[in-house]
């Protein structure tokens, strides 16, 4: 039996601060892209263009995904050379740069078959062994470098997209029956901000991201599936695409553009 589903796309306007910041990012991106085109070097700067597109996706979620990338407290953790987020399922190239496993796959697949792919950091031909195990990271260091620990959260301002999510989840909660929801994002930092906001709005949440061990991931899934009080499961797109059968959830939210 095939059950019907509904896809709803919300369109909302930024507040003034978000709009000004996103406009500046878009203007800078357009200027750089036009420069590459006018000089005839667009294909030689594919990695830079990939990064510019990534920035535009991040600013649509929350300005802090860009503003707080390199703030104090963000050291000693592996950072992806493509998305500039803490690396999920971290792997290392032959030129000794770190990547999220999924980011590296997507990046290399974006090139035509047989073409030479340059490293986005050092611009030499990129070679990665995708069979290598994840680079081990200290769990406490990863937690310490969370974006939540790099922001004065008492002064923090939410974003239009996060507030839309909170509003939609509140509407589900107002019904008599319990609804479980999954929130997907490519950016771990976005999920951390969403988690912080939802918990302060009274929602019980659980998270699954690429920094977790297989046992930790399974425990998170079990907790979401079997605890009636947990309403929201925050899942990284880079970590949650394998062997997930979350039939308990009746709503899915994708927050990335």
Model regions and ranges:
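ASCE P-loop NTPase motor core, strongest for the SF2 helicase catalytic module
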Residues: 1-6, 15-19, 23-257
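Interdomain hinge/linker elements that couple catalytic modules in large macromolecular machines
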Residues: 11-12
């Amino acid at each position: 039996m095939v059950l019907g589903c509904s896809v709803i796309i919300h369109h909302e306007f930024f507040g003034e601060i978000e709009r000004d910041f996103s406009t500046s990012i878009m203007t800078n991106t357009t200027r750089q892209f036009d420069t590459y085109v006018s000089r005839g070097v667009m294909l030689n700067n594919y990695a830079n263009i990939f990064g510019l597109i990534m920035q535009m996706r991040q600013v649509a979620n929350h300005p802090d995904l860009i503003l707080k990338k390199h703030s104090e407290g963000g050291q000693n953790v592996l950072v992806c050379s493509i998305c500039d987020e803490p690396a999920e399922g971290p792997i290392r190239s032959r030129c000794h740069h770190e990547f999220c496993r999924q980011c590296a796959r997507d990046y290399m697949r974006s090139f035509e078959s047989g073409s030479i792919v340059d490293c986005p950091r050092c611009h030499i031909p990129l070679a990665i062994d995708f069979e290598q195990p994840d680079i081990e990271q200290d769990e406490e260091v990863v937690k310490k470098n969370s974006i939540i620990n790099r922001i004065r959260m008492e002064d923090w301002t939410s974003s239009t997209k996060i507030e839309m999510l909170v509003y939609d989840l509140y509407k589900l909660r107002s019904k008599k029956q319990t609804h479980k929801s999954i929130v997907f994002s490519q950016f771990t930092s976005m999920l951390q901000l969403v988690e912080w906001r939802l918990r302060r709005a009274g929602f019980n949440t659980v998270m699954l991201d690429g920094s977790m061990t297989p046992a930790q991931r399974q425990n998170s899934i079990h907790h979401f599936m079997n605890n009636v009080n947990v309403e929201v499961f925050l899942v990284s797109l880079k970590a949650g695409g394998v062997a997930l059968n979350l039939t308990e959830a009746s709503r899915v939210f994708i927050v990335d553009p």
